[in-house]
C-alpha cells in the first residue's frame, strides 16, 4: 500500500530532490510530500593536492553528479518499478567557501581552491581589519584578494565568482544564484538587507582600486536568495548534463543552492533563534542562531547565516575525538594481551559509560587533546598531554571523564565569549557526530559543559542531502507567510522531539573546577609545544 502511494507521489511530481557535494561523497536524497526519504543515490570522490592547493576537477564534479543521479534513479526503479523522469522541486548543496572563477564565456580561469586551503593568511587578516568583521582564511573573498595581491594573470578576466553549489546550480539552471547561508561564506552579509554588505563591498573596491581591474566586486558576485525563493528551473542543457540518457525532463523548479552548514542546520531542525547544533567528531563546532548580531568582532567566532538569513555564530575547534581514539587503542591492546580479542564498539560504550561514574571534577586529572593547534586558546600547534597532581585520584572512571571533558573544553572557551560577553541565550542544542554515539553519555556531559539542554535525534544522521531536499520541499510546499522554522517544526519534525538531556548541576559544577585547572595548565601545553619536537 505504501509503495503504491509513493509511486503516485513520484508520478504526480510531489517529490523533492536534494543533491549535496560533500568532501568525500556526493549524495542524493529524494523525499515525498511528507518529507520522508523514499530513494537515495551516491558517489564517492576525493580532493587532490596539486601544486600545493587542495582541489577538485570540474569534470569530476559532473562524473559524480551523473553517477549520483543514475544510482538514485536506479533506486527508484528497483523499489517502485517506474522510471524517474521528473521531480517536483530540486536543490543543490555543497562544501562552502573556496574559490571558483569564470570568464564571460563561462570558462574556468583558475583551479578550484577548496575551503581546506590555508594560504590566505595575509588577506584574511587585512580584510578582517578593513571590514571590522572576522574573515576566515577559507572564505571566497580572502581567496580573491590573495589572487589580486599575487598579481595572478587571470584576475582581469573574471566575470563570475561562485561556490561549488553555486556553480552546479548555474550549470543546471543558467541562473547565477546563491542561497544566503552559502553567500555568507563568500562575503559578509548585511542582516537587514539579506544581501552582501554594500559598505564592505565599497571598501574592498577601494582597496584594489590601484589595480585598475575592469570589474567591481558587485559585478562578479552571484544574486543572493533566501530559503523559499524560486531560483530558476532545470534547462534542457542542464537536464542532459545530469542525465545523459535523456529521460530527465527540463522545467523542474530549483530552490537557492545552499552550503553544507545551512543544510546541516535544516537537517537538525536548528534554524530558529536561540537554537543551535553541536557537531562532534574529529573536530568539533557549534552553530548558534542569534537574536541579534554580535556587538564586536571576535577572531574565535565566524559569522554566517541560516538559509533564511538569521545571523549565526560559529565556534570551530580543530580537535575533538582523535586523542580519545588513541587512548581507546591503548586499552584495546591491553585487553587483547589478556583475552585475545575485543569488541571495539563495546569497548567505546564501556569507556564512555564508565565516565559517568567518575568524580564530577575528574578527581584532579587533566587532559589536553591538541593533536593540532587551537586558535580558540591561542595555539598554532599542539601536543597531546595527560597530567595529574600527586594526590589526584587515578582510576578508570576519573580518567575516562577527563578524556571526554577534554574533547569539549576548547569549545567552551568560544561559547563563553557568546554567553558571557554577548549574553547570548540558547534554549536547546542538537548534538550529532561520533561523540554522541554511545546513548546518553556525550549528551549528558555536553549539557553540563555548555549548561544547555542537548537533544539527540535519530534523523541527525540523514545529513545535508536531506537538508537541501527539505529546502526544495519548503519552496514548493510552504503556506503563504510560513517561516522555515515553522515549516520544519510542523511538517518535518513534528512530534520527533528526540532525546533531551538537561544539564545536571553537580556535573556542571565539576566541569567548572576542571576548567579552572585546564586554564592554569595551558602553560604546560605551551611549554610542550615550544620544547617537544
Task: Give residue ranges: language-model regions.
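Active-site core segments that coordinate phosphate-bearing ligands/cofactors
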Residues: 2-11, 17-18, 122-138, 142-178, ...
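Conserved beta-strand positions that form and line the central face of beta-propeller blades
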Residues: 42, 114, 500
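Active-site donor-binding loop signature of nucleotide-sugar glycosyltransferases
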Residues: 43-45, 226, 503
